[in-house]
From Swiss-Prot:
Comprises two domains: an N-terminal domain containing the nucleotidyltransferase activity and a C-terminal HD domain associated with both phosphodiesterase and phosphatase activities. This is Multifunctional CCA protein. Catalyzes the addition and repair of the essential 3'-terminal CCA sequence in tRNAs without using a nucleic acid template. Adds these three nucleotides in the order of C, C, and A to the tRNA nucleotide-73, using CTP and ATP as substrates and producing inorganic pyrophosphate. tRNA 3'-terminal CCA addition is required both for tRNA processing and repair. Also involved in tRNA surveillance by mediating tandem CCA addition to generate a CCACCA at the 3' terminus of unstable tRNAs. While stable tRNAs receive only 3'-terminal CCA, unstable tRNAs are marked with CCACCA and rapidly degraded. The gene is cca. NCBIfam families: PRK10885.1 (NF008137). It catalyses: a tRNA precursor + 2 CTP + ATP = a tRNA with a 3' CCA end + 3 diphosphate; a tRNA with a 3' CCA end + 2 CTP + ATP = a tRNA with a 3' CCACCA end + 3 diphosphate. It comes from Vibrio cholerae serotype O1 (strain ATCC 39315 / El Tor Inaba N16961). CDD domains: HDc, NT_ClassII-CCAase. A single active site specifically recognizes both ATP and CTP and is responsible for their addition. Its cofactor is Mg(2+); Ni(2+). GO terms for molecular function: ATP binding; CCA tRNA nucleotidyltransferase activity; CCACCA tRNA nucleotidyltransferase activity; cyclic-nucleotide phosphodiesterase activity; magnesium ion binding; phosphatase activity; tRNA binding. GO terms for biological process: RNA repair; tRNA 3'-terminal CCA addition; tRNA surveillance.
Length: 403
């Protein structure tokens, strides 16, 4: 039995990135031998075992053969005679197809080190096209490693385009699409996930709501970049620079989906996009099973970002109404999240990336002023029932007016 460290842990170690998970491949063993050695079986579709002490995953070396459509349509073969090289051959990218033995010796049969040095994401073998999930995985790695200068190899992009055209992407489950998108949000450049999917034609299949923003014009006076899709990528980039919150990053990416359904006769204006975007976000989140906390912030940003951009024009009553609609009294963290998205939206415009966003301060001050009005004082003054809320709002408006 020989045990090798494989995949992401080897890659990230060589890139001098933090290693969070370590996966191992076991060559020359069997399920019976693993159990006898004290390992715990956890794999459903193929033999994966947890180490008795570290609890790290150890998989028996295996080969795969395509048997049907989708990313689950594989027959798995594992036996003591499957070699390490055969196991590494089935992996997606050369930089993920390296292994290390217990002496620290690197095993790199497919040029992973070469591609790490060249900063290239390249498929291991033509079998890459058999697994549609790899399109999303490569897009995610492009987002994860873009800050280091990595790009997708032209021939790999061609295979991704082939998968996108084949109809195989439609067989991905909602959960897998969200899982890869969600992982991409934590990257240094989450916008590259969308960009790479767009470049290979996959965005139209997996996230058509975002894909249809490309080619839709906005008024050049406010949006020098004009194209709504390009604006969305720029906003995604700005959001990642402003916040580590995955909720904020997601909401920023989907806040303008309403612009994708504006009738061309109304272009380049999008008067109703804050309203029309709500149903699109709802159905997108339902379709790919986006968690409620992500959906709720996205809806709040979609509904209110235009109002917040006009903060200096709003009456105190309107500011208070916006704060109420954002539910900031019960969810105080919500205002900061929404304002970060709005600032990313404001800066996600060509040539305006460093533009200040005074609207943020205007709304924060309005919130603090309104927060300073205590409901206990209203009750102490003798107000009861519905009159408590009326008087509380009146006093909060006065506090905002006094700024």
């Amino acid at each position: 039995m020989q045990i090798y460290l494989v995949g992401g842990a080897v890659r990230d170690q060589l890139l001098q990135l933090p290693v969070y998970d370590r996966d191992w491949v076991v060559v020359g063993s069997s399920p019976q031998a693993m159990l006898a050695a004290g390992f715990q079986a956890v794999g459903k579709d193929f033999p994966v075992f947890l180490h008795p002490n570290s609890k790290e995953e150890h998989a028996l070396a295996r080969t795969e053969r395509k048997t049907s459509v989708g990313y689950t349509g594989f027959a798995c073969h594992y036996a003591p005679d499957v070699t390490l090289e055969e196991d590494l051959l089935r992996r997606d990218l050369t930089i993920n197809a390296m292994a290390q033995d217990n002496s620290g010796q690197l095993i790199d049969p497919y040029g992973g080190q070469r591609d790490l040095a060249a900063k290239v994401l390249r498929h291991v073998s033509p079998a890459f096209v058999e697994d549609p999930l790899r399109v999303l995985r490569v897009a995610r790695f492009a987002a994860k490693l873009h800050h280091l200068g990595f790009t997708v190899a032209e021939e790999t992009m061609q295979l991704m385009a082939k998968i996108a055209q084949s109809g195989e992407l439609q067989h991905l489950t909602a959960e897998r699409v969200w899982q890869e998108w969600h992982k991409s949000l934590s990257a240094h450049h989450p916008e590259m996930f969308l960009q790479v999917l767009r470049d290979c034609g996959a965005l139209a299949v997996v996230l058509p709501e975002i894909d249809r923003l490309f080619g839709v014009p906005q008024p050049e006076k406010w949006h020098p970049e004009i194209d709504t899709g390009i604006h969305t990528l720029m906003v995604a980039k700005q959001a990642a620079q402003l916040s580590d919150s995955l909720l904020v990053r997601f909401a920023a990416q989907v806040h303008d989906l309403g612009k994708g359904v504006t009738p061309p006769s109304e272009w380049p204006r999008h008067k109703l996009h804050c309203h029309t975007g709500l149903n699109i976000i709802e159905s997108l989140c339902e379709r790919i099973r986006v968690p409620n906390e992500f959906r709720d912030l996205a809806l709040a940003v979609c509904a209110q970002h235009s109002n917040i951009h006009r903060a200096d024009e709003l009456k105190p009553t309107t500011k208070l109404k916006v704060l109420g609609l954002l539910d900031v009294w019960r969810k105080p963290e919500r205002l900061e999240q929404v304002l970060l998205c709005c600032e990313a939206d404001h800066r996600g415009r060509l040539g305006l990336e460093s533009e200040p966003y005074p609207q943020r301060e205007i709304f924060l001050r309005a919130y603090q002023a309104a927060l300073g009005v205590a409901v206990q004082a209203v009750i102490a003054d003798g107000f009861q029932g519905k009159h408590i809320k009326e008087e509380l709002d009146k006093r909060r408006v006065s506090a905002i007016e006094a700024l």
